[in-house]
Swiss-Prot record:
GO cellular component: a single term: cytosolic small ribosomal subunit
Protein name: Small ribosomal subunit protein bS6
Residue ranges, compositional bias (Basic and acidic residues): 105-117
PANTHER family according to UniProt: MITOCHONDRIAL 28S RIBOSOMAL PROTEIN S6 (PTHR21011), SMALL RIBOSOMAL SUBUNIT PROTEIN BS6M (PTHR21011:SF1)
Organism whose genome encodes this protein: Ruegeria pomeroyi (strain ATCC 700808 / DSM 15171 / DSS-3) (Silicibacter pomeroyi)
Domain of life assignment: Bacteria
Membrane-spanning residues: none
InterPro entries to which the protein is assigned, alphabetical: Ribosomal_bS6 (IPR000529), Ribosomal_bS6_sf (IPR035980), Ribosomal_S6_plastid/chlpt (IPR020814), Transl_elong_EF1B/ribsomal_bS6 (IPR014717)
Protein keywords: Ribonucleoprotein, Ribosomal protein, RNA-binding, rRNA-binding
Family annotation (SUPFAM superfamilies): Ribosomal protein S6
Entry similarity comment: Belongs to the bacterial ribosomal protein bS6 family.
An MF annotation (GO) of this entry: structural constituent of ribosome
Role, per record: Binds together with bS18 to 16S ribosomal RNA.
Gene: rpsF
Biological process terms in GO annotation: translation
Amino acid sequence: MPLYEHVMIARQDLSNTQAEGLIEHFGAVLSDNGGSLVDHEYWGVKTMAYKINKNRKGHYAFLRTDAPASAVQEMERLMRLHDDVMRVLTIKVDEHAEGPSVQMQKRDERDSRRERR
C-alpha cells in the first residue's frame, strides 16, 4: 500500500487531550477503510505565520500512514468537514523516515548549519 505523511492543524482553543483525540479518531477512520496509522506525533501549540479562521495559533499533529488512496481521501474529506481542523497537508512518500521528525528532535541532535562568513 502507498505511504503517506499528513500534517494537521487544529484550533487553538482545544485542550491537548482533545487534539490528541482527533489523531486517534482519524486513525480509526483509516483502519475502518483498510489502512493503518503507522506513527503519529503531537507537536503542540505553535504560532502560525498568518491568521487562519481568526486564529493565530494551532495544535499541530504529524501522522505517518500506510493506506490505500480511497482511505486517505475519506480521511481528508472528514478532516475538511470537521470544525476543529483548520488545515491539512498530505504528501505521498516512498518510505517513512526512521525516528522522530525534525520538529521533535532537539536542536543539538540536528545536523549543524554551515559556518557563517
